[in-house]
């Protein structure tokens, strides 16, 4: 008998609400016969915040934690000051649920036009650290609003936090083309950069089949444009990973095809899967948003739960859909139906 | 009678030594009749360090300071641990000489092939803060080399430091298309980001003709690929500026055409002009390196000293050279001669 998994669903705002149902449908269809899903919906995001001021109430966070995984749509609204929802909801979940691997595949699908003239065969994964670095909210300001104001941001990096994500990257490389590229800025951020490099060298010795090299973040942004097919697994910190994955999304034809997983690889807390795109208030409510990235995030969820064959069904359907119909204008529902029909 | 300017020349390492003489020749030719130059050469960089361990001796730094401007080639050698020369020489000069504006124009020249399929008309300038942020070397580590290691990097940002570079950007925008885009990550780096935004808003009020908007660094890396012609003046901090200008260099066909100025806009200390590319040990000594970026850095030096017409001569010659011969393989000396012949 198929086991039932409990999934917390946070559709969020804008197009998040429109694409998430398609992620759920794809999940069910792909796992038919091998897994069942029971959903718990959470009304979190900008609309909730504007309505009653709540961002992530403690009891709701506890209930989220009791699930096997989380599906998130998108969160955000231009009416809310930058940082409030990001730090109070999205990053809070990543940190509290210790989702230390932020996994972001970039693939140029056949049928998608890259902005690059000669993109080559792009298929790499960014393994972004998710719980440290400049994202930990350390920092402050004195004499705010005066000419003497000083504002700081502190990047905190621990050997504990770095080593576990480095191990994840090498393990992942073993299943791929066996190459890891560490990206940092160790010629300037010498403390953190040196520690990352030492840990990569050490863990690398345990994986003699995996080659690894190093690039400064500035050089990496060049190669993502000039030679993106050189990459297999890119391993980097929280901020550099944020930057590189958006650039990568652009290079593979837009973040509309990019999903991501915020993974607690020790399974202590549920992992979270989301499209990389935002809530896109400009096209919200018009049945226009492309649900492909959300559907791909369902595939990542399935892989995380161990259902590789089910995930493969989604990938195959998405690839065929994009190749055949990627350039036609379709509604959210039409794309969702087309992909499901192929599964 | 033409005034004589004293120029400190730091050819540095690798191809730095090959391209810098062409920057000097272009400088002289362009300023013929309006300015003369007297050079003081400094033997600094990797080769000097490997020879006698000196990076930037105090007396040499004092002599550098006594010049009107600095021409730098490139510094670096793979035999030296990352950070030593960067922090001991390049960044030390930027900081000690208070070069708070790191000015980096990006232009797609006619005759250069961009890696983008539809690059459009790319012509923007990045105004990167040069003396603060994550570059100040604040940070450290405890329990180094143990599983309990913690490494920090601290970004220090002051209203004083931010306001002066913001003013520079708005003034520059008045001479261009009157648009400033602030790039930061204010939804995560809330202390520094909020201060940058407030200061931009405040200074912006003094320039009612200049419009300004904001982009997160991750979004900016997308637009540099998907729609780079939208930018006019990009204003950003030290680290984000480092990243964006390399990506921009790639988008305009390679850092070989990109020059930069580290500018002390209060003229208290000399400003420094350099090509964006590195010392390229792989092609050093082969008369292969393209001197165009170095020659363009001479044009920036001339503009800084107020010789706009002379600078224009260089720009016109470089543009014509690239349009006609940009795709032919030429030696360093041939490119140098060709450009000079047009001036
Ligand atoms: C919304 C923001 C906090 C977030 C981040 O910076 O991580 C986003 O850009 C992302 O990449 O998921
Ligand atoms: C060499 C390095 C310290 C430097 C920087 O990060 O500023 C370089 O990348 C640059 O952009 O000039």
Curated annotation (Swiss-Prot), chains A, B:
Substrate binds at residues 94, 104, 128, 218. Binds 1 Mg(2+) or Mn(2+) ion per subunit. Its cofactor is Mg(2+); Mn(2+). It is an enzyme of class 1 (oxidoreductase). Keywords: Amino-acid biosynthesis, Branched-chain amino acid biosynthesis, Cytoplasm, Leucine biosynthesis, Magnesium, Manganese, Metal-binding, NAD, Oxidoreductase. Catalyzes the oxidation of 3-carboxy-2-hydroxy-4-methylpentanoate (3-isopropylmalate) to 3-carboxy-4-methyl-2-oxopentanoate. The product decarboxylates to 4-methyl-2 oxopentanoate. NCBIfam families: PRK03437.1. This is 3-isopropylmalate dehydrogenase.
């Amino acid at each position: 008998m198929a086991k039932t998994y409990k999934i917390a669903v946070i559709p969020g705002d804008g197009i998040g609400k429109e694409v998430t149902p398609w992620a759920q449908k794809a999940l069910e269809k792909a796992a038919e016969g091998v897994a069942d899903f029971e959903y718990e919906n959470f009304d979190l995001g900008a609309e909730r915040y504007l309505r009653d001021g709540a961002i992530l109430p403690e009891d709701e966070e506890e209930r989220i934690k009791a699930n096997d995984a989380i599906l998130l749509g998108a969160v955000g609204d231009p009416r809310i000051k930058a940082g409030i929802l990001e730090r109070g909801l999205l990053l809070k979940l990543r940190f509290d649920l210790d989702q230390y691997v932020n996994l972001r595949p970039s693939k140029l699908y056949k049928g998608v036009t890259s902005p690059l003239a000669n993109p080559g065969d792009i298929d790499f994964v960014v393994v972004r650290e998710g719980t440290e670095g400049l994202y930990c909210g350390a920092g402050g300001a004195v004499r705010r609003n005066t000419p003497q104001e000083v504002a700081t941001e502190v990047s905190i990096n621990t050997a504990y936090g770095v080593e576990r994500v480095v191990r994840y990257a090498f393990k992942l490389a073993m299943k791929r083309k066996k190459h890891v590229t560490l990206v940092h800025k160790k010629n300037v951020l010498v403390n953190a950069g040196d520690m990352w490099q030492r840990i990569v060298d050490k863990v690398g010795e345990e994986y003699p089949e995996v080659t690894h090299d190093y690039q400064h973040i500035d050089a990496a942004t060049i190669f993502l444009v000039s030679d993106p097919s050189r990459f297999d697994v890119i391993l980097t910190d929280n901020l550099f990973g944020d930057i590189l994955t958006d650039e990568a999304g652009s290079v593979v034809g837009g973040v509309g095809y990019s999903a991501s997983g915020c993974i607690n690889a020790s399974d202590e807390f549920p992992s979270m899967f989301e499209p990389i795109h935002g809530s896109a208030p400009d096209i919200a409510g018009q049945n226009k948003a492309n649900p492909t990235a959300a559907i791909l995030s369902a595939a990542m969820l399935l892989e995380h739960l161990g259902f590789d064959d089910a995930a493969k069904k989604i990938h195959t359907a998405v690839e065929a859909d994009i190749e055949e119909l990627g350039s036609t204008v379709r509604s959210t529902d039409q794309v969702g139906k087309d992909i499901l029909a192929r599964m």
